Amino acid sequence: KTDFIIIAVPTPIDKKNKPNLRLLIDASKEVSKILKEGNIIIYESTVYPGCTEEVCVPVLEKFSGLKFNKNFYCGYSPERINPGDQKRKLSNVIKVTSGSTKLIARKIDKLYKSIIKAGTHLAPSIRTAEAAKVIENIQRDLNIALINELAMLFDRLNLNTSEVLKAAGTKWNFHSYKPGLVGGHCISVDPYYLTYKAIKKKFNPQMILSGRKTNNSVPKFIANKIKDRLNNKRSKILILGFTFKENCPDFRNSKIVDLTKELKNNKVYIYDPLVNINEVKIKYKLNFLKSITNKKFDVIILAVTHDVFRSYLKNKVFDNLKVDGFIYDVKSYFKPNGRIISF
C-alpha cells in the first residue's frame, strides 16, 4: 500500500525565460492514473508560489476523478541536494516541509524527519515553502551578480577584484562571493519562475531581472577581454571545464556554450574529463578534446576548477601555452601576473 508519492522532476524555462512545466504536468498525469483514496502527493521541484495548488492539483483531479483535500492530499518539500558537494548530503541538510492541511503537513513532516538527521522546518503553507525555495537561489544569483558587476567596474579602474574582496572580507559582516559564470539548472533558471509570477501580478521585479541580465552578460565580457588581448587575431583557445559547477558532470545550461559563441571566430577547444563527450555532442556542436597532452594554445581559459585539474594547474598548465600565450582565470584561482589575467 502506497501512502506517499513523491514527484521530483526538472522545471526548466523556455526560450523566452518563461516556466516550462511540461515535465511537472506530465508527471502529475502519470501519478493520477494510480492515485488512490487517501494518497499524499509531495512535490519537490522548484516552482513559483502557488504552482502546486494552481497547476498540479487541477491535473491530479482531472485525470484521477478524485477530489483534492477530500480523497487525496498534497504537500511541498523542496529538494536541497547540492551536486558535487560531499559534505552537505540529503540527510544533513534541514528539509522544509508543508502540506495542504495541518494534519497532512504533520504527516509529511514526520516522514522526512525519519530520514533527515538535520531536522525539518514545517512551513505554514505550501505557497510559503514554494517561495522559500525559489528565493534561496535568487539570493545567491543576486549576490554573485553584484560581485560580477563590481569585477567589471574594477577592471575599468585597473583594480584586482580578488585583492579588493580579500580586503573587504576582513570585516566581520562582509559576505564572501567570487565573480564568475552563472549557469546550471537552478541559480540561473529559478529567478525566472518568481519573475513570471510577479509580472502576472503586475509587479516589476526589476532587481531580480537586473541580476539575471548582469550574470548573463559575463560570457561576452570575458570574450571581449580575451579578444582585446589578442588584438582580435584568430587564435587557438582551450577552455578548461564545461560543467556548470565544480566536481559535477552536469552540463545543463552551461555558460561555456555562450562563451564559445562569443569566441566563434577563433579555434575553440574544450577539455573536461568529467563530461561524457558523446552525450554532450548530441546537443552541442563543440570541439571536445579527450587529451591535451603535447598540445599548444594561445589562450587557456580556466572556467571550472574541478579537483582533477588541481595537479595540472599547479605543475603543467604552462606546458600547454605557446610562448606568448596567456591564461584567463575566470575562477580567481591564480595570482595574476603578466601571463595570467583574472576576472
State where each predicted segment sits:
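Structural/interface elements that position substrates and couple domains in central-metabolism enzymes
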Residues: 1-343
